[in-house]
Amino acid sequence: MQQFEWIHAAWLAFAIVLEIIANVFLKFSDGFRRKWFGLLSIAAVLGAFSALSQAVKGIDLSVAYALWGGFGIAATLAAGWVLFGQRLNRKGWIGLVLLLAGMVMIKLA
């Protein structure tokens, strides 16, 4: 395992934030009918992958990708709830708990 440095964690956090922004812009784009939001979504995805590429210089790829994806899903779910009134059903909540448990297990491995 690589030695932990805060700069790589910061890059990972930035990648997560950009992924959430990309997903919100994608929703606002309404299937790319609102092109500016669609283009902003693409730019945010490119930025997220660029930030992730910096994060994996100091964080194992498997850990960084799992955390990026997992936190991105959980935070996008929260954004969907706050911004769009989207709610999870019982199965969705179970899936979210399993996702979070999996992220913890990967980090502890």
Swiss-Prot record:
GO terms for molecular function: amino-acid betaine transmembrane transporter activity; antiporter activity; choline transmembrane transporter activity; spermidine transmembrane transporter activity. GO terms for cellular component: plasma membrane. Its main location: membrane. GO terms for biological process: glycine betaine transport. InterPro entries: Small_drug/metabolite_transptr, Small_multidrug_res, Spermidine_export_MdtI. It is a multi-pass membrane protein. It holds the Pfam family Multi_Drug_Res. The keyword Manganese does not apply. Keywords: Cell inner membrane, Cell membrane, Membrane, Transmembrane, Transmembrane helix, Transport. The chain crosses the membrane at residues 6-26, 36-56, 64-84, 88-108. It comes from the Bacteria. It is found in: Cell inner membrane. Catalyzes the excretion of spermidine. Belongs to the drug/metabolite transporter (DMT) superfamily. Small multidrug resistance (SMR) (TC 2.A.7.1) family. MdtI subfamily. Forms a complex with MdtJ. This is Spermidine export protein MdtI. It comes from Enterobacter sp. (strain 638). The lineage of its organism: Bacteria, Pseudomonadati, Pseudomonadota, Gammaproteobacteria, Enterobacterales.
